[in-house]
Amino acid sequence: MTDIEKMISGLIYDPADKELAEMRQAAHILSKKYNDLYENDDDRNKILDKLVPNRGTNVYLQGPIQFDYGCFTEIGDNSYANFNLTCLDCAPVKIGKNVFMGPNVSLLTPVHPLHVQSGKTQDEDIDKHK
């Protein structure tokens, strides 16, 4: 099982996995580019096409936005997010149709180990990538 499969299944995974790290960095770069554009700039939709490819029509994200991956998020038609949408989509996030989100909404899927031994293993994995 790959670390991506583990992650989206809610299992312990290596967040420093090369493929995951590259995907996360790409999403962070696209989020930054989106945030740097004026809201009437047509390039915002081109960025969202790459960042959140699983979205319906007439989706508007006010910005600023922040996604961990973007590709694990689905947004239904006619949905709107006000300022400061944060979506840590380490597991699938599904936003339905006709959803209106206020400012400062955070959709957070990461789960950190609660058992000491599990935490030690993950800490050791993180330390080796410093």
Segments from the language model and where they lie:
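Terminal amphipathic alpha-helical/low-complexity segments used for targeting or macromolecular assembly
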Residues: 1-58, 114
